[in-house]
């Protein structure tokens, strides 16, 4: 299981508005994300900023703590088991769980902290909804 992409994720109350702000400010490409409330800003160097409205199942991140790296796995028909394997590996190596892995309409996700306490989103997209490059 290899990660295919690392990007940044930014929680927003209005993801479309914030994505438009960043794409226009940096003359970057605005792409649709995995869901209606998810947008991807693609910069000229290939870096991506994924702007999303958090699930109602989790609290909105505190201001100033809404930006985190996202480790996106290869799309899968069975994203939750893929994510759980990576999560188990991360915990064995000193990471800690912030939020349990859960299945969402776009795939599976879990929030962890690295050994120094930095937040990290682990994302396993559902193969049928994975965005194309």
What are these regions (language model features)?
Residues 1-20, 69-73, 126-133:
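N-terminal beta-strand motif that seeds the catalytic metal site of vicinal oxygen chelate
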Residues 7, 87-133:
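Vicinal oxygen chelate
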Residues 36, 68, 107:
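Short coil/loop residues immediately preceding or within conserved phosphate-binding loops
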Residues 2, 9-49, 56:
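Core segments of cupin and vicinal oxygen chelate
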């Amino acid at each position: 299981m290899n990660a295919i992409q690392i990007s940044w994720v930014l929680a927003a109350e209005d993801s479309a508005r914030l994505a438009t702000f960043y794409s226009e400010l940096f003359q970057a490409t605005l792409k649709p994300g995995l869901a209606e409330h998810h947008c991807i800003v693609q910069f000229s160097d290939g870096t991506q900023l994924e702007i999303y409205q958090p699930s109602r199942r989790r609290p909105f991140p505190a201001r100033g703590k809404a930006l985190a790296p996202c480790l996106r796995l290869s799309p899968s028909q069975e994203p939750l088991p893929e994510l759980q394997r990576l999560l188990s590996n991360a915990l064995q190596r000193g990471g800690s769980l912030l939020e349990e892995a859960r299945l969402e309409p776009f795939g599976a996700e879990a929030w962890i902290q690295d050994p120094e306490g930095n937040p990290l989103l682990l994302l396993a997209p559902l193969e049928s909804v994975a965005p194309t490059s």
